[in-house]
Amino acid sequence: MVKIAFNTPTAVQKEEARQDVEALLSRTVRTQILTGKELRVATQEKEGSSGRCMLTLLGLSFILAGLIVGGACIYKYFMPKSTIYRGEMCFFDSEDPANSLRGGEPNFLPVTEEADIREDDNIAIIDVPVPSFSDSDPAAIIHDFEKGMTAYLDLLLGNCYLMPLNTSIVMPPKNLVELFGKLASGRYLPQTYVVREDLVAVEEIRDVSNLGIFIYQLCNNRKSFRLRRRDLLLGFNKRAIDKCWKIRHFPNEFIVETKICQE
């Protein structure tokens, strides 16, 4: 006898359910594997992004520190420490005809100035305001002991006049500080005499960039002329002089009257 067997519906359903479970488990495993990989990639990307942020912040910190240090150095170079001194001296002008005819006590004329004295730079910057009782011009004057130069900026004409520094009549900055200290304390009698300079503008200076930063700042973009002493000019024609003017200041314990003539 031959037996013929048939799958019952219940067995078919169990087989299909088993296959569904296996497929679900397979998809779950694949999903977990992919999720793990994605998490690792995301973690690596996050770590890489954090590293780049740290490097960027570190670079910005170095740049900021460099800017601060560089700015401080530039400020120190261009804005060095200095003290403004103010003082006044009086002098008797013996060449004034009015004084020679005047009887009694002599008439002393005041010379007032402000001095920006920078001992570290070995320089004195003197500001001579408009005088009240004399015929001299207001001026800005630089005595640069490092460069060995003196520069006069006539504030009425707007021109610069340059000459070698005359150390026989200009005190070094340290001594000038002491002089202004005496004037301020009243320990020095501010009545003195006059030393006269007779100078002539002989040639125009086109470039002042090699004369130091201070003279450059004073005279750049201005007409600048070289000064020579009149007594050193051979064959000098006095008739060629068109105009002369005076600048008075005290770079010492006396007044210096600088007479400048120009064609």
Curated annotation (Swiss-Prot):
Glycans are attached at residue 166. It is a single-pass type II membrane protein. Keywords: Disulfide bond, Glycoprotein, Membrane, Signal-anchor, Transmembrane, Transmembrane helix. Disulfide bonds join 160-219. Its main location: membrane. The keyword Transmembrane applies. The chain crosses the membrane at residues 54-74. Pfam families: BRICHOS. Belongs to the ITM2 family. This is Integral membrane protein 2A. The lineage of its organism: Eukaryota, Metazoa, Chordata, Craniata, Vertebrata. The gene is ITM2A.
